[in-house]
UniProtKB/Swiss-Prot annotation:
Organism (species): Mus musculus (Mouse)
PROSITE patterns: GOLOCO, TPR, TPR_REGION
Disordered as annotated region, ranges: 420-475, 508-531, 644-673
One GO location term (cellular component): cytosol
Name the record gives this protein: G-protein-signaling modulator 1
Gene name as annotated: Gpsm1
Membrane topology term: Peripheral membrane protein
Coarse class of the protein's main subcellular location: cytoplasm
Length: 673
């Protein structure tokens, strides 16, 4: 049952009203202070409960209410309830603008920008962060200016990182728009670094160095990236920040991998592993083991690689990370193949297949099936290659895997696999030399080129010439196996659809409903009206009735626009009294944003139409034991030639030597080659 609303000031005598409001103000402030204390202690859920209670009590102090909104938004942000955080930061921004609090408006704009960035609405976030920067510069707030510069760089950085993931490109090989976005991020980070150096803020300098290193890493400037990460590492050690130190070592390892210094990278990853154990972070420990296993693979030390991949597998199983567990099984299979243990490799390949099927990883499933087939053939467990478990390669290239792997098969093996695969993919055979069926020109279909080259008379004469007899349907069934894969439309079908569209276009006009009876009669009298008649009809439709209809739409839409306007009086927790109503009316009009702000807002709002597009299919979820950037899949594309030189042939069966089958290690994970 809802509690009764508190009495308003007009219903109570003067002294009673003042005492009631005094108690309510004290209660609201006490609740807010307790919520702030709990949030500082890290108990955000309890802090949110106290802040919400303070809003329920309400206050007439606009600055107090603005502070409560800001704290509530920040608390919801840390709880990852970003929609609620966005709501309260919007309330804070509206209230700050209404009462003319420029510093409050700047902080609210910055908080909005950070929340929009996490939601992936980068262009809107840039508008808000730029507003924060403008006000900070206007007020001479150097600390706020530095924070705004960092936030803008962070938004551009996040946007560029997401675009680089979508492009699936290696660091340094990015599309121009992604490079431009990352360059913008680097510029703002440089400005932030210069300002925080002037302010003497070492902690902020460390953050700037770390983000500059990450940005240059994505741009492919690996030497510059190592320079910035070394600066980040030094500041982290200065402050005793173990988490930042671990991140710096990990980033240094990634950069040295792309510089080809694998031994140096391994040392940095070992430091990462040591710090992750000190921090008691199992997920990060598994990531370090995964990176070390891949690095020792590049160093051709397969026994150590298998050791670290086994550690990764154990932690992934403890944390129920099926994605990481599957990747560990795949890596272990490759390592055991390189060590000459195909039986153990087959065990992990089957486990990889099982996990890929569970999590819906189509690429992983295809890779595992191919590995299992090749390992079974190598072990000589099957009597012939035709009896092996044939990998389902249909759609392999469409799933993003490299089709070049099939080119490594020997000629004999390729002859075994090509016939069924070609039939599945194309619906016809391409390599049976003894088959002599009728050509495509034998089919009784109208050919567009002949139609336009020979003319209609030749087309009419063609059936009587008897140069080509129609193909019997029974022959088609015998010679061309039926397939469920759709055939691409030919030029004949395109011609047919062009003609169909041309003649159907006029029929559509005949089926339209006329607005007036006179027009209906005219439509019945003439099936295909002339251009003049259509122009006259279009002029008739602009009748007074039509104008009344549009007037009705305009009036209804105007009411909907009014419903969408922001109202200060609807803010939760706000009690409007004679003391603050003047601030809400007078000061609110004086703080209208300038034209530059609205021009910038319109510019970035134009991209909101992208938010309405259908999203692409979800990618494979990232497991907690996998690094944020699975750098080894990138390494394999960069080091493709090196990897081939490092492969070890199986000392296998005669079947393998005769067929020339490649190692299962050549089958790469999704996104790798």
């Amino acid at each position: 049952m809802a509690s009764p609303a508190p009495p308003v000031a007009e219903e109570l005598p003067g002294p009673a009203s003042r005492r009631l409001y005094s108690r309510m103000e004290a209660s609201c402030l006490e609740l807010a202070l307790e919520g702030e204390r709990l949030c500082k202690a890290g108990d955000f859920k309890a802090g949110v409960a106290f802040f919400e209670a303070a809003v329920q009590v309400g206050t007439e102090d606009l600055k107090t209410l603005s502070a409560i909104y800001s704290q509530l938004g920040n608390a919801y942000f840390y709880l990852k309830e970003y929609a609620r955080a966005l709501q309260f930061h919007k309330h804070d921004l509206l209230l700050a603008r209404t009462i003319g609090d420029r510093m409050g408006e700047a902080k609210a704009s910055g908080n909005l920008g950070n929340t929009l960035k996490v939601l992936g609405r980068f262009d809107e976030a840039i508008v808000c962060c730029q507003r924060h920067l403008d006000i900070a510069q206007e007020q001479g707030d150097k600390v706020g200016e530095a924070r705004a510069l960092y936030n803008i760089g962070n938004v551009y950085h996040a946007k560029g990182k997401q675009l680089s993931w979508n492009a699936a490109q290696d660091p340094g090989h990015l599309p121009p728009d992604v490079r431009e976005t990352l360059h913008r991020a680097s510029e703002f980070y440089e400005r932030n670094l210069s300002l925080v150096k002037e302010l003497g803020d070492r902690a902020a300098q460390g953050r700037a160095y770390g983000n500059l290193g990450n940005t240059h890493y994505l741009l492919g400037n690996f030497t510059e990236a190592t320079t910035f990460h070394k600066e980040r590492l030094a500041i982290a050690k200065e402050f005793g920040d173990k988490a930042a130190e671990r991140r710096a070592y990990s980033n240094l390892g990634n950069a040295h991998i792309f510089l080809g210094r694998f031994d140096v990278a391994a040392e940095h990853y070992k430091k990462t592993l040591q710090l992750s154990r000190q921090l008691r972070d199992q997920a990060v420990e598994a990531q370090a083991c995964y990176s070390l296993g891949n690095t020792y693979t590049l160093l051709q030390d397969y026994e150590r690689a298998a050791e670290y991949h086994l550690r990764h597998l154990v932690i992934a199983q403890e944390l129920a990370d099926r994605v990481g567990e599957g990747r560990a099984c795949w890596s272990l299979g490759n390592a055991y193949v390189s060590m000459g243990s195909p039986a153990q490799a087959l065990t992990f390949a089957k486990k990889h297949l099982q996990i890929s099927q569970e999590i819906g990883d189509r690429n992983g499933e295809l890779t595992a099936r191919m590995n299992i087939a090749h390992l079974q053939l190598a072990l000589g467990r099957l009597t012939s290659p035709a009896a092996a478990e044939k990998p389902d390669l249909a759609g392999y290239e469409a799933q993003g895997a490299r089709p070049k792997r099939t080119q490594r098969l020997s000629a004999e093996t390729w002859d075994l696999l090509r016939l069924p695969l070609d039939r599945e993919q194309n619906g016809e055979t391409h390599h049976t030399g003894d088959w002599r069926g009728p050509g495509r020109d034998s089919l009784p279909l109208p050919m567009r080129s002949r139609k336009y080259q020979e003319g209609p008379d030749a087309i009419e004469r063609r059936p009587r010439e008897g140069s080509h007899s129609p193909l019997d349907s029974a022959d088609v069934r015998v010679q061309v196996p039926r397939t469920g894969i759709p055939r691409a439309p030919s030029s004949d079908e395109e011609c047919f659809f062009d003609l169909l569209s041309k003649f159907q276009s006029s029929r559509m006009d005949d089926q339209r409903c006329p607005l007036e009876e006179g027009q209906a009669g005219a439509a019945e009298a003439t099936a295909a009206p002339s251009v003049e008649d259509r122009a006259a009809q279009s002029s008739v439709t602009a009748s007074p009735q039509t104008e009344e209809f549009f007037d009705l739409i305009a009036s209804s839409q105007s009411r909907r626009l009014d419903d969408q306007r922001a109202s200060v009086g609807s803010l939760p927790g706000l009690r409007i009294t004679l003391n603050n109503v003047g601030h809400l009316r007078g000061d609110g009009d004086a703080q209208e944003p300038g034209d530059e702000f609205f021009n910038m807002l319109i510019k970035y709002q134009s991209s909101r139409i992208d938010d309405q597009r259908c999203p692409p299919p979800d990618v494979l979820p990232r497991g907690p034991t996998m690094p944020d950037e699975d750098f080894f899949s990138l390494i394999q594309r960069v080091q493709a030639k090196r990897m081939d030189e490092q492969r070890v042939d199986l000392a296998g069966s005669p079947e393998q030597e005769a067929s020339g089958l490649p190692d299962p290690q050549q089958q790469c994970p999704p996104g790798a080659s």
